[in-house]
A protein has these predicted regions:
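Generic, well-ordered alpha-helical scaffold segments in large soluble proteins
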Residues: 12-16, 42, 63, 67-70
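An acidic- and aromatic-residue-enriched active-site/binding cleft used to recognize and process polar
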Residues: 25, 38, 43-44, 79-82
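Substrate-binding cleft/loops of secretory-pathway carbohydrate-active enzymes
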Residues: 32-34, 40-41, 86-93
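Short, well-ordered secondary-structure micro-motifs within conserved domains or adaptor modules
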Residues: 33-49, 53
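A conserved amphipathic helix/loop scaffold
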Residues: 2, 47-166
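Aromatic-Pro/Gly-enriched surface loop or interdomain linker
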Residues: 1-38
Length: 166
């Protein structure tokens, strides 16, 4: 299971006093988001875990942007909302404040950041898997864990809501 982030998320959630629903992109388009406080998208690009080509649907992306802006929390794990063919690799990059450089961009530098204290967010001794080629999209995300200039855990305010990347 080391390759499948969503399995670890499911295991963690199963021990918490929270209600969990699995929703589809069709559910999002049908307006179901108002029932939820948090949406999690986890997995590798192109996989059913992450959503693959479903992220090409502008209606899905627009509805999620609006929902977060109005107070929701979007948690993206590994390569959330990743799909080729758009100005950002992660369709939810404006919400997350993080994107991935797949080599398609000519980068003239990255936003500089300082790693902020994550006390109370990460349990003692816990780590976040290191990811390569990640960068901040606007320099406003709070970086709570990083390695070699790559943000690994961030929180980014988006309207009344936020995006969390790990």
């Amino acid at each position: 299971t080391y390759m499948h982030d969503l399995i670890h998320v499911n295991e963690a959630l199963s021990g918490l006093p929270v209600d969990v629903d699995f929703i589809s992109f069709e559910n999002v388009k049908a307006g179901i988001l108002d029932k939820y406080d948090i949406v999690i998208n986890a997995g590798r690009a192109g996989s059913a875990w992450s959503g693959g080509d479903a992220w090409k649907d502008e209606d899905v992306v627009t509805r999620l942007y609006r929902w977060v802006y109005e107070g929701g929390a979007f948690i993206g794990i590994d390569q959330p909302s990743a799909v080729e063919g758009f100005d950002s690799y992660y369709r939810m990059a404006p919400v997350l404040g993080v994107d991935e450089d797949t080599g398609a961009k000519v980068c003239h530098g990255k936003w500089q950041f300082k790693v902020e204290d994550s006390k109370g967010i990460l349990p003692e001794g816990a780590t976040v898997p290191e990811k390569e080629n990640r960068f901040l999209t606007d320099g406003k995300a709070k970086v709570l864990a990083a390695h070699d200039g790559n943000p690994d855990l961030t929180i980014h305010e988006f309207g009344k809501g936020c995006g969390v990347y790990m």
